[in-house]
């Protein structure tokens, strides 16, 4: 560093890029942390006053590394540091002079604000995410950069879906549906199968939540169709968690569809979907998600009992709700337990009247 500081800083920056790539590939937090340290070292030489473009490049790279570290941490400190790094980079990388770097920083900033908003349930952060993704699309025009254009719409859809949940405003779900459908204009199953499937899954999830406000059976059927489309690509072997989440979503939509139409004809399909998730969401590996699936299966049997299933269905419902309660306790997630207790009491009261 003393003899050739500029070259030393360049090597540190390049080392950081290599470590980020390796750390993400190996899901290795330690390597990504080392990358962040390498970028910080480079920034000791690459100051804004002396080397503004190199400084902005290393700040952008540091933001990328910190966003990778943040995947392993459930707090907000690392995310805030990453956002500050991207904001710094944007003071040099203007749209007029460095359009691609500017768009990349805007897109990455949108992802950071999305995660911050999700973790804090802060609508203002999610609105910042929306603004950043929309800004990126000023450069990522469909004609020149079709896949980047589609990516920005997919990311926007994810943020708008979260914003709908945080604000309880269904219009955001409608906006998210439009965003996902725009992404699907470029994401084709034949050419971009994984992104196509993830977008279908996002669309299915958003349509499910939209149906909660409009009680429209067609919206639920569209949700189920989108998630089933996603499962054509997202298999249990290649994407187990995505596969299980899609199965869970199908089960929830089928259950709700039966409630809207006042019929039990969808219960068998819903039960099969919830049961399928247990191949991935085991009690040992993911106790909280396992508990939610136990709760969902309890709802299936409770519904079946109300459609004439009799005493055995009530008893199965109680057993599944008890399992769910135990799973939530083991996971240290106590919020759903009072509601689960209420369900158990109600089922027992109904059973006593039989």
Where are these regions (language model features)?
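Ankyrin-repeat and related helical/solenoid repeat scaffolds used for protein-protein interactions
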Residues: 271-339
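Conserved alpha-helical positions within TPR/SEL1-like repeat arrays
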Residues: 6-24, 53-68, 100-118, 147-162, ...
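Eukaryotic tandem repeat interaction scaffolds
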Residues: 205, 225-232, 236, 241-260, ...
